[in-house]
Every structure is written in C-alpha cells, then in structure tokens.
C-alpha cells in the first residue's frame, strides 16, 4: 500500500491484474473495492483532493 496525503485516507493499494483496490482510512479500517478500472485508481492517486475523489467516484461503488 502507498501512503497518501489526505485528511481521511492513510494509504491505497491496487492490483491491476485483479482490479482490486484497498483503501486504508486514518481511523484504522481498511476496505476492499473490486472491479476498479486502472483509470479510476490513477485518478485517485493524482487527484488534488483524494478524499473528494473517493467520495465522488469510488464510495458506494465497486463492492466485492
């Protein structure tokens, strides 16, 4: 997992082979997301606000 600069998210991991993303929140919980396209992961990692991108694009989607 790669540490990120965010007030809510601590780290993000992504496996392009399985399209599985893991997001670890600063509160301690880690969530898995399945079927995440590579461009969504790249968008998250390059977003000006990782938390806002997560809320807009990932949250409540890509459930495993």
Q: Where is each model-derived feature located?
A:
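Acidic/histidine-enriched, beta-strand-rich ligand/metal-binding domains
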Residues: 1-64
């Amino acid at each position: 997992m790669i540490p990120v600069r965010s007030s809510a998210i601590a780290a993000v991991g992504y496996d392009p082979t399985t399209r599985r993303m893991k997001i670890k929140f600063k509160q301690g919980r880690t969530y898995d997301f399945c079927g995440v396209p590579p461009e969504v992961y790249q968008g998250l990692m390059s977003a000006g606000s990782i938390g806002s991108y997560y809320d807009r694009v990932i949250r409540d989607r890509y459930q495993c």
